Design a protein with these regions (language model features):
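PP2C/PPM-type serine/threonine phosphatase catalytic domain
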Residues: 1-139
């Protein structure tokens, strides 16, 4: 599998995007994109902590029997790791948004939190786009 990465900080002073990816058994693959939350402390560290802990959890616990459950457990684990990181550096609040993809021979599984989107294209046309988790969308 060939992976390309691109990140653009836009009008921000600091780029708090982080991408982590790796191989899984049976030609599977995991890819996570995180972006530190503006207005919170150490967004870059939050993004890295969450992405790396999700990737490691999925790689260490991967089975093809219940991938959605493994993804949920990985997100919970990453939140625990983020809280430990927050305490270790003395930050008041840390957070990030995330988008993730797990690919197997048969399926692609996605999950996301916040306003980072996942798009699916078929024959050059957008056929699916995740909906942002935001206060406006919840109203």
């Amino acid at each position: 599998m060939i992976i390309y990465e691109y990140s653009n900080k836009g009008c921000r002073v600091e780029n708090q995007d982080y991408i982590s990816h790796g191989s899984l058994p049976d030609d599977g693959y995991v890819c996570i994109l995180t972006d530190g939350m503006g207005g919170y402390s150490a967004g870059d560290e939050a993004a890295k902590t969450v992405a790396e802990s999700i990737r490691a959890y999925i790689q260490n616990n991967y089975t093809q029997t219940n991938i959605p459950n493994i993804i949920n457990e990985a997100i919970t684990y990453s939140n625990d790791e983020l809280m430990l990181k927050r305490l270790s550096i003395g930050a008041q609040r840390m957070g990030c948004v995330l988008a993730l993809l797990v690919v197997t021979k048969e399926y692609a599984y996605i999950d996301w939190l916040g306003d980072s989107r996942v798009y699916m294209f078929r024959n050059g046309k957008e056929v699916y786009r995740t909906e942002d988790h935001s206060m406006i969308n919840e109203m």
